């Protein structure tokens, strides 16, 4: 008698369809298309985990630059001055200070200006 392996096949297909739950159209119903969509989504997820770091760094830099320009400096001059003054504070914290604690940020700008 021929063994068709129905339960194993059904379980495997069910696993892929469960991963594709919430996808639009045939991507959540059809096994082959669902499997392709899930694998593609993993590719996007891998790529975007790297990109999110770049995007946040860009955001922080543009925020710092926007906060430092009215105080008479450019971003690069500000960062260079902080490095010369041996102030070790990362860009994330600098951008948060620029948004929430403007007085503290202005103090850092004055430190950066004086260290030239």
From Swiss-Prot:
It comes from the Bacteria. One of its GO terms (cellular component) is ribonucleoprotein complex. Keywords: Ribonucleoprotein, Ribosomal protein, RNA-binding, rRNA-binding. InterPro entries: Ribosomal_bL20, RIBOSOMAL_L20_CS, Ribosomal_protein_bL20_C. One of its GO terms (molecular function) is rRNA binding. One of its GO terms (biological process) is ribosomal large subunit assembly. SUPFAM superfamilies: Ribosomal protein L20. Binds directly to 23S ribosomal RNA and is necessary for the in vitro assembly process of the 50S ribosomal subunit. It is not involved in the protein synthesizing functions of that subunit. NCBIfam families: rplT_bact. Belongs to the bacterial ribosomal protein bL20 family. This is Large ribosomal subunit protein bL20. It comes from Mycoplasmopsis pulmonis (strain UAB CTIP) (Mycoplasma pulmonis). The gene is rplT.
């Amino acid at each position: 008698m021929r063994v068709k392996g129905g339960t194993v096949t059904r379980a495997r297909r069910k696993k892929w369809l469960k991963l594709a739950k919430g996808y639009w159209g045939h991507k959540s119903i059809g096994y082959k298309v669902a499997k392709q969509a899930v694998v593609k989504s993993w590719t996007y997820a891998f790529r975007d985990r790297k990109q999110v770091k770049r995007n946040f760094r860009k955001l922080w830099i543009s925020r710092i630059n926007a906060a430092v320009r009215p105080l008479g400096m450019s971003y690069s001059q500000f960062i260079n001055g902080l490095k010369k003054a041996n102030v070790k504070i990362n860009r994330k914290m600098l951008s948060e200070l620029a948004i929430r604690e403007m007085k503290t940020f202005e103090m850092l700008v004055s430190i950066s200006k004086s260290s030239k």
